[in-house]
UniProtKB/Swiss-Prot annotation:
<keyword id="KW-0793">Thylakoid</keyword>
<keyword id="KW-1133">Transmembrane helix</keyword>
<keyword id="KW-0472">Membrane</keyword>
<comment type="subunit">
    <text>PSII is composed of 1 copy each of membrane proteins PsbA, PsbB, PsbC, PsbD, PsbE, PsbF, PsbH, PsbI, PsbJ, PsbK, PsbL, PsbM, PsbT, PsbX, PsbY, PsbZ, Psb30/Ycf12, peripheral proteins PsbO, CyanoQ (PsbQ), PsbU, PsbV and a large number of cofactors. It forms dimeric complexes.</text>
</comment>
<dbReference type="GO" id="GO:0009523">
    <property type="term" value="C:photosystem II"/>
</dbReference>
<comment type="similarity">
    <text>Belongs to the Psb30/Ycf12 family.</text>
</comment>
<protein>
    <recommendedName>
        <fullName>Photosystem II reaction center protein Psb30</fullName>
    </recommendedName>
</protein>
<dbReference type="GO" id="GO:0015979">
    <property type="term" value="P:photosynthesis"/>
</dbReference>
<dbReference type="GO" id="GO:0031676">
    <property type="term" value="C:plasma membrane-derived thylakoid membrane"/>
</dbReference>
<comment type="function">
    <text>A core subunit of photosystem II (PSII), probably helps stabilize the reaction center.</text>
</comment>
<keyword id="KW-0602">Photosynthesis</keyword>
<feature type="transmembrane region" description="Helical">
    <location>
        <begin position="7"/>
        <end position="27"/>
    </location>
</feature>
<dbReference type="Pfam" id="PF05969">
    <property type="entry name" value="PSII_Ycf12"/>
</dbReference>
<keyword id="KW-0812">Transmembrane</keyword>
<keyword id="KW-0604">Photosystem II</keyword>
<dbReference type="InterPro" id="IPR010284">
    <property type="entry name" value="PSII_Ycf12_core-subunit"/>
</dbReference>
Length: 35
């Protein structure tokens, strides 16, 4: 079960980075008033 939890944790972290990356970039540009 430990291995499964590790895989799920890694997949969750990867998904979080994939979703948060563009969101952070969007927020940075939005706060700069570039959009």
């Amino acid at each position: 079960m430990g291995i499964d939890f590790h895989l799920i944790a890694n997949f969750g972290a990867l998904a979080l980075i994939t979703l948060a990356g563009p969101a952070v970039i969007f927020i940075l540009f939005y706060r700069r008033g570039a959009l």
